[in-house]
Design a protein with these regions (language model features):
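A well-structured
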Residues: 1-272
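Single conserved hydrophobic/aromatic residue that forms the stacking wall/gate
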Residues: 270-273, 277-281
Length: 281
């Protein structure tokens, strides 16, 4: 049975014409969006057709970016040291910073549209995307200046994005020492994690403690990466005006704090009941 992932449904390879053509299409789309954004914010009137065009451009660009990113990320999920995957990951990150100023301008323009409900009601396209438009308006209060947004986006490539790649690389290449049938073996972390579902209780126990012990090999590197990411999050949260990183996460997750508290309380009750059952057994 074939156990390797097939990504040919997305692209045949990084060197394929399909992948290269979409990269070129991305460059053209970015250039076009940047030019169009300047025209939109400088010219008054025609709000409804402009907003419809924004939806059209945003949808097409998101679909294109999603396809490219999926191929890169899935390739690296299977092989974190894939040189082509790493190279194109950096290339994509760099390209995407080029649209930040334009998208910031457009989102701020949308947030300043007067009588937005009337504008939306006059278009079937806009009515279909009302939630998306209203969310842009709601989140606009956290926007920084066009230039600041661009700077943050570019610095993330050598900040949190780089730290995240380091953390993923350390974890994905981690080997776990575990005793199986009286023999010590060195296995990939993913293999040991899958042992959590093995019907043999003793093997599950060994796998758990072996996993925890293995993290000591990379704990300093992972801690440094997480601290770097956390530091950036704290800084950006403060700049944008969020009350805390949790507040930012709740906003981005479309969740209120009361819902989160209810979920956490339910989890605590469940784990408490489960622990009581284990003790009874």
């Amino acid at each position: 049975m074939e156990l390797n992932w097939s990504l040919k449904e997305i692209y045949p390879s990084f060197e394929s014409e399909e992948f290269k053509n979409d990269l070129e299409k991305l460059d053209q789309s970015i250039k076009s969006l940047n030019t169009w954004a300047d025209e939109v914010v400088c010219e008054e009137g025609n709000v409804r057709p402009k907003l419809e065009e924004y939806i059209k451009r945003s949808s097409k660009l998101s679909e294109l970016i999603g396809r490219l990113e999926a191929f890169v990320s899935l390739t690296l999920s299977a092989d974190t040291k894939n040189s082509e995957g790493l190279r194109y990951s950096d290339i994509l990150d760099s390209k995407l910073t080029e649209i930040v100023e334009a998208t910031t301008k457009l989102e701020r323009w949308i947030s300043n549209i007067k009588d937005i409900d009337t504008v939306i009601k006059g278009s079937e396209v806009l009515k279909e995307h009302e939630f998306y438009i209203k969310e842009i308006i709601e989140k606009s209060k956290y926007l920084l200046s066009d230039r600041e947004e661009s700077i943050i986006s570019k610095m993330k490539n050598t900040g949190s994005n780089a730290w995240l790649k380091l953390k993923d690389n350390l974890i994905s290449n981690l080997k776990v020492d575990i005793e199986i049938d009286g023999e010590m073996k060195e296995l990939p972390l993913t293999v040991v994690l899958n042992m959590a579902y093995d019907p043999n209780g003793e093997l599950r126990r060994k796998a758990y403690f072996a996993e925890i012990e293995s993290y000591k090999k990379v704990e300093e590197g992972v801690a440094a990466a997480l601290n770097g990411i956390k530091g950036e999050v704290l800084t950006v949260c403060d700049l944008r005006g969020y009350k805390s990183p949790l507040d930012m996460t709740l906003v981005n997750s479309r969740m209120d704090e009361e819902s989160l508290d209810a979920m956490l309380e339910a989890c605590l009750l469940y784990t408490s009941d489960a622990a009581d059952e284990v003790q009874l057994v």
